[in-house]
């Protein structure tokens, strides 16, 4: 895997838990790249990042969210992505930033402020991937796993929720 987010401790721990069956059948995974870049826009060489968002539409940085999600769903290891629907909002903050910096009115800004992509796999599982670098949302990669028997979430706090299991009273010491 070339995506660095698959190597974070929480992602690796959750992947191991999923592979061990702790969450039961994994049904849905979420991931994203949400990062308010307002303070960083001037730092990008030749304004490359804003320029790319102005000229291209869609989730232009899907790998942070998709890498860990694909690992948990066993994409290309028994399952594959089959159906994809992606939508974005209108562009508000990108054109406003350019106008503030240059005085230039931008009418053809391509990428919306928020892009959401929903993917269904061959085996009937779903994945939601989001991209948002234009609004004041706090940083998040939204990593979430929804299983038949458990749940994991990394942002805004790391948490696990597992279905309680029935324990035979003879196995529990008093």
Predicted regions located by residue number:
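A structure-centric signal for secondary-structure junctions around beta-strands
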Residues: 26, 81, 114, 139-140
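A short, structured loop/turn motif at beta-sheet edges
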Residues: 23, 120-123
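Hydrophobic residues in well-ordered beta-strands that form the structural core
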Residues: 1-2, 154
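Arginine residue identity/basic-tract feature
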Residues: 49, 57, 77-80, 120, ...
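Predominantly a Rossmann-like dinucleotide-binding segment in NAD(P)-dependent oxidoreductases
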Residues: 3-108
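NAD(P)-dinucleotide binding in Rossmann-like oxidoreductases
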Residues: 106-112, 122-174
